[in-house]
Design a protein with these regions (language model features):
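Conserved oxyanion/phosphate-binding beta-strand-loop segments in alpha/beta enzyme cores
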Residues: 2-20
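Glycine-rich N-terminal segment of FAD-binding domains in flavoprotein oxidoreductases
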Residues: 15-122, 135-140
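Short, conserved charged micro-motifs
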Residues: 43-46, 105, 214-216, 255-266, ...
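Short loop/turn motifs at secondary-structure junctions and domain boundaries
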Residues: 116, 144-149
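C-terminal substrate-binding/cap subdomain adjacent to the FAD-binding core in PCMH-type
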Residues: 152-320, 336
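Activity-critical C-terminal alpha-helical subdomain
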Residues: 294-297, 307, 395-457
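Substrate-recognition/cap regions that form aromatic- and gly/pro-loop-enriched pockets
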Residues: 301-408, 414-418
């Protein structure tokens, strides 16, 4: 079958195929048959329609920040979304961005108009389409939910190659199946996002604690306090068997107003062992990972294997489970530049159909961000195996996976994950991707359609 006429290029050179078989995790390598570098949205629609007729699987790749082959496909077509990066139509309450735009691009455009997305990921190099396909968590999620909860409208290419606009009011089934839908029912090509007024300054508190119990209590108090815009906990190895607990909290403000410095926040003293307070621009705060990224790129560690795990835990089980995991975890098992994230999320702020959360008003995002040695593949395998153990413990205590992980997942695992939403996802897959070609890297298995690829003409 002949390839459709394209404004861009469908390439199959060695360099492109090797590139498409890599991601940030460097643990899974699925080699496609071809890579599409689209000249526009019409190319995405045309190649998906072509793939459906020829039995080829399709995966969209944004910034390549997946860690376990989620945006790869073995013998299919990978769509490089990077050039579909236009950010436009910035208004007082919304902005439209193509799926390949990075969150840094979106922020630049909205800040010029005095606006910002309500939730930003820590690393702004991720793509809009990528995070909206999984959720998009950040330090303001205790107030605003995930990034998908700020989506007003999507443009989506379905598994039949149709370009469809969807929202809560139009084509609702596709809208619900696409937000946090792991690319199973459609490829996001653009999104209209709700934005809020942006502060110009940030008062940042970096508070260190001696133990996990105090650390959790302080974060819980801060989100109940209600005045802190950003709350995030980080845990680092300080010495063998000893962990350093760092709480980063931020108040956003506009001069001439100035927030009051306090380490005894709202009259509560949680026994900090070190306090650091600084005042920076909102832009610099949003880009706070940039110096660390530059250092890791210079050292080469940015290109090391990253075996990451993120789960969301019910509040009642968090202290015991995290304490148990930290008691067994060593600095070597975390890796040289690895760290742990632990911060609260109010589940009543999560409104997207396919976003999974524990049956708990307060939940905790817990992430083990492991970095493996580049010289020893056994390190990666050991970290992935350890991730699976933690994942299973989290699920057993009522937690859920945040679906970006370096964890092998079976179709049965995904049925457990989606729980009461599984049948809805399965029905949506049958409706919007009847050939079963979209985003096979997750191994979800919602569709039984056979794959018998035909030659590309």
């Amino acid at each position: 079958m002949l390839v459709p006429e394209l404004a861009g290029q469908l390439v199959c050179d060695e360099s492109s195929l090797r590139w498409a078989a890599e991601d940030f995790g460097h643990a899974v390598h699925r080699r496609p048959r071809a890579v599409l570098r689209p000249g526009g949205v019409a190319d995405v629609a045309a190649i998906v329609e072509f793939a459906g007729k020829t039995g080829l699987s399709v995966a969209a790749r944004g910034s390549g920040h997946s860690t376990y082959g989620q945006a790869q496909t073995n013998g299919g077509i990978v769509i490089d979304m990077a050039k579909l990066n236009l950010v436009s139509d910035v208004r007082a309450d919304r902005v439209t961005a193509q799926a390949g735009a990075r969150w840094s691009d979106v922020l630049d455009a909205t800040l010029a108009a005095g606006r910002t997305p309500a939730v930003l990921t820590d690393y702004l190099g991720t793509s809009v389409g990528g995070t909206l396909s999984v959720g998009g968590a950040g330090g303001t999620s205790h107030q605003h939910g995930f990034q998908v909860d700020s989506v007003e409208e999507l443009s989506v290419v379905t598994g039949t190659g149709r370009l469809v606009t969807c929202s809560l009011r139009q084509n609702r089934r596709l809208f619900d199946a696409t937000r946090a839908g792991l690319g199973q029912c459609g490829i996001i090509v653009s999104a209209t996002l709700r934005v809020i007024p942006a502060a110009s300054r940030v008062r940042r508190y970096r508070l260190q604690y001696r133990d996990l119990t105090t650390f959790l209590a302080a974060q819980h108090h801060l989100i109940n306090h209600g005045k802190f815009d950003f709350v995030q906990g980080q845990i680092f190895p300080a010495a063998p068997g000893v962990w350093q607990y760092l709480l980063e909290a931020a108040l956003y403000y506009m001069p001439p107003g100035t927030p009051v410095d306090a380490t005894r926040i709202d009259g509560q003293d949680y026994g900090t062992i070190a306090d650091e307070i600084d005042d920076i621009s909102y832009r610099d705060f949003a880009h706070r990972m940039a110096p660390g990224e530059a250092a890791l790129r210079d050292s080469g560690e940015w290109s090391y294997p990253h075996a990451w795990l993120t789960v969301v835990l019910p509040s009642a089980a968090t202290a015991s489970l995290v304490g148990e995991i930290l008691a067994r975890l060593t600095a070597a098992e975390l890796g040289q530049s690895g760290l742990v994230l632990l911060y609260p999320i109010r589940t009543d702020r999560l409104h997207t159909l396919l976003t999974r959360s524990p049956d708990s008003k307060l939940a905790w995002l817990f992430a083990l961000l492991r970095t493996a040695s580049v010289d020893n593949p056994a390190d990666v395998a050991a970290m992935i195996e350890a991730n699976r153990v933690v994942h299973d413990r989290a699920v057993a205590c009522g937690g859920v996976t945040y679906p970006i992980n370096s964890v092998p997942m079976s179709a049965a695992d995904w049925r457990i994950h989606f729980g009461p939403r599984w049948r809805q996802l399965q029905a949506a897959k049958e409706e919007f991707d009847p050939h079963g070609i979209l985003t096979p890297g997750y191994g979800i298995g919602t569709h039984s359609a056979p794959h018998c690829p035909k030659p590309i003409g």
